[in-house]
Regions:
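Short secondary-structure transition hinges
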Residues: 103-143, 153
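Phosphate/oxyanion-binding loops and surfaces in catalytic or ligand/nucleic-acid-binding neighborhoods
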Residues: 76, 101, 105-109, 123, ...
Length: 217
C-alpha cells in the first residue's frame, strides 16, 4: 500500500502560519535593533501588523517567542556543524571553518544582537527546553569528533566525550565573551580557539610515526 500523503494545509492554516512567521520576524528585527528587554509585545504586534490579542493566540508570552527563536537559532548552528563535517580537509581545518562561520554570523548582526544571543542561550537551557536542545548540540559536536577519530586525526587516547565537552565549552565561552565584552576580538579569538582544539585533539607526531612503522611491517 502506498504511503498516505498528508492533505495540503487549508486557507486558515496557511493564514495562521503566515501570521506566526510575521510575529517571529518582527520580534527578531526589534530585538536586534532595540534589545530584548526594551521591546514590548505591543511593539512586536505593531510591526507585524496584527492586533495585540493575536500575539497570544501564538505565544503565551514574549519568553515563549524567545524559546522558538532559540530553537531556530540552534537549527542554524546545527547546519553550520554539518556543513563543516561535509567539507574536505582535516579535522583541524573543519574546526577552523566552523568557528570562522560562527564569528562571521555573529558579526553580521546588529549591535543589540549581543543581548538577543545571551537571552536565547539562557532560554534554550531552561529546564523545559534545555535538555533536548543541549543533547542535539552535544550530539552534533560529538559527530565531528568521531569523524576525526575515524580518519585517524583525533588521537585514540583522547576520550571522545572529553573532546566533545572541550569543543562545546570553547564555543560557549566564545559566544559569552563576545556578548559581554564590548571590544572582544571575536574573529581572532575564534580562530585561536579552533587552532588550539585542533592541536589538542591531534595525533602526536611520535604516535603517527609509530603507527606508520607498524603498518610497514
Amino acid at each position: 500500500m502506498a504511503p498516505s500523503v498528508p492533505p495540503a494545509p487549508g486557507r486558515r492554516e496557511r493564514r495562521r502560519h503566515e501570521v506566526h512567521e510575521r510575529l517571529l520576524e518582527a520580534a527578531a528585527a526589534l530585538f536586534d535593533a532595540r534589545g530584548v528587554s526594551a521591546t514590548t509585545v505591543a511593539e512586536i504586534c505593531a510591526r507585524a501588523d496584527v492586533a495585540d490579542k493575536t500575539f497570544f493566540n501564538h505565544f503565551g508570552s514574549k519568553q515563549d517567542l524567545l524559546r522558538e527563536l532559540a530553537g531556530r537559532s540552534l537549527g542554524r548552528l546545527l547546519e553550520r556543524i554539518e556543513q563543516a563535517r561535509k567539507t574536505g580537509g582535516t579535522t583541524r581545518e573543519r574546526l577552523l571553518l566552523f568557528f570562522a562561520d560562527v564569528a562571521a554570523d555573529l558579526e553580521r548582526a546588529g549591535p543589540m544582537h549581543r543581548e538577543l544571543v545571551t537571552e536565547m542561550i539562557h532560554v534554550a537551557h531552561e529546564q523545559r527546553l534545555g535538555s533536548e536542545q543541549a543533547r542535539a548540540l552535544h550530539a552534533a559536536f560529538r559527530a565531528l569528533v568521531e569523524d576525526g577519530r575515524a580518519a585517524g586525526e583525533v588521537a585514540r587516547g583522547h576520550d571522545p566525550a572529553t573532546c566533545t565537552e572541550l569543543l562545546l565549552g570553547a564555543f560557549y565561552a566564545l559566544v559569552f565573551d563576545w556578548a559581554h565584552l564590548p571590544d572582544y576580538p571575536l574573529r581572532r579569538r575564534a580562530q585561536a580557539a579552533a587552532r588550539f582544539l585542533g592541536d589538542a585533539f591531534a595525533v602526536s607526531p611520535r604516535t603517527a610515526r609509530r603507527t606508520q612503522g607498524r603498518g610497514r611491517r
